[in-house]
Amino acid sequence: ETSDLILRTLDAGAHQHRAYAGEPLPTFETVARACQALGLHANVEIKPAQGFEQITGETVARQILALWGSAQLPLVSSFSEESLVAARRVAPQLPLGYLCVRPPEDWMRRMDALAAYSLHCAARKLDDSVIATAQAAGIPVLCFTVNDRQDAEALLARGVTAVFSDRIDSLRGL
């Protein structure tokens, strides 16, 4: 565990290139403001420490409401259903993404219980029957982590709504 005081002293840019030396770690507020200024739609993934699922979900939801206000709210996802339930309780208006590596047999029931907007799963673990079921129900399917343009094109052609990528530069124009 590292305190906020220490985190604020770290250099987030020097290891990328000397031109970025001295760049501080971005805060949640900084990222929220940048997304709003640039017109970007954010996906906020809740990653709670074990035993802190509920409080983390609640805290993230409160922060989102404080930072986004009446602007388009970010999509909120998590592998922790408990965190998503807590976020929903605090902010019923938040669009939630049900996050799983491979959709379980009862993924639709879980999404219904969460009142989730979208299904997020690993690109390599997704089968066409899930895509078809989701499409029939009007549920967007988002896949992670897709860094290859041809893979992204193939997923979109299969009916996936969007992809998460570490290399958005390679997916330009899709």
State each model region's role.
Residues 1-98, 114-117, 121, 135-137:
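Metal-dependent phosphodiesterase/phospholipase catalytic core, i.e.
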Residues 18-21, 97-174:
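C-terminal active-site rim and adjoining tail of enzyme catalytic domains
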